[in-house]
Amino acid sequence: MSHRDHGADGWESADFPITCESCFGDNPYMRMTRADYDKECKICSRPFTAFRWRPGRNARFKKTEICQTCSKLKNVCQVCLLDLGFGLPVQVRDSALNINSHYSVPMSHVNREYFADEHDPKTRAGLDYESSFGKMQPNDTILKLQRRTPSYEKNRPKICSFYTIGQCKRGAECSFRHEMPETGELSHQNIRDRYYSVNDPVAMKLLRKAGEMGTLEPPEDESIKTLYVGGLNSRIFEQDIHDHFYAYGEMESIRVMAEDGKYDQSGSNQQQQGSIAHTGLISQQQNQHSQMQQYYMQPPPPNEYSHYPSMDTQRMGAAFSTQESDGSSTSENNRAYSSYSYPMPPHQPYPTPPPYIDIYIYI
């Protein structure tokens, strides 16, 4: 039987999956299994390397659903098929950024496989136009709807089917959720519909939410020229604010109002410094508090000779008996060597560390 070249057949091999932070989970000690050409991509129907892991202690096992070529074409996660940069469905992202990618990937079986084979080398080199989704600048709609923190709720176990009919006998030991399934449009979700951005119920809900959001309109009174910007920290300076709003017109003045950075004198030093750092007035790097660190702890100076008899190079090797005029034997010579003691050098005192100084920064 001749050897089969999987690369020539278009089969995909990878070392690590392309997933979002939510699908990876919050477990830093994660064990992942890899299976070469184990599953078929649900978009292009080509075999690819599948990965399987458990994102958390109380989470279900997750696995890759599509190949990396299809993932790079849309810049989506291989598991949940959400955008890697914004955490939104493909339909929401394309509608907000005015991207017409509905017909960019064919839907028929033969055309999908041919399209994937043609774009596979381009996506690996990063030359395809679809692979530049992550470089696009978000607009106001994206900034309002994007997911800023990872959501681990979708990693929960699936609903127990026996519990829904009242026949689950495991109780608290059941590895599935004891909840009733949701009804409505969100219960009908399809991987291909989400990838092709067609009839995605989650995307429809987010688009309706974006339409209901109010827009920031200028006031009718043109004498009002003051704009309040909140939620800033100490890392943003006046020049940064000026550079950001300069594209919208000239500014008369910028006034930064910082809160009083003096903390309460009660409590320990760590709590007092934490009260300042949590307000965002100063950065954590400027508020570091070292706990009794010994500086300039140098090792003792080296010695010119060995401290232990076993380190003597003259005694290495076998000892041979010699005939001497005084009639001494080998055992006597060995006893003479063993009776010799190597003096240990005196202990060198460590240099005195500098005095510890507490530095507090007030704003």
Swiss-Prot record:
Residues in C3H1-type zinc fingers: 154-181
Gene3D superfamilies: 3.30.70.330, Zinc finger, CCCH-type
Presence of keyword DNA-binding: yes
Coiled-coil residues: none
Residues annotated as domain RRM: 225-310
Signal peptide: none
Compositional bias (Low complexity): 283-297
Any matching Pfam family: STL11_N
UniProt GO molecular function: RNA binding; transcription cis-regulatory region binding; zinc ion binding
InterPro entries documented for this protein: Cwc2/Slt11, Nucleotide-bd_a/b_plait_sf, RBD_domain_sf, RRM_dom, STL11/RBM22-like_N, Znf_CCCH, Znf_CCCH_sf
Superkingdom as given in the UniProt entry: Eukaryota
Polar residues composition-biased segments: 320-336
Region annotated Disordered, chain positions: 281-348
Keywords: DNA-binding, Metal-binding, RNA-binding, Zinc, Zinc-finger
Official protein name in the record: Zinc finger CCCH domain-containing protein 53
Organism of derivation: Arabidopsis thaliana
Taxonomic lineage from the root: Eukaryota, Viridiplantae, Streptophyta, Embryophyta, Tracheophyta
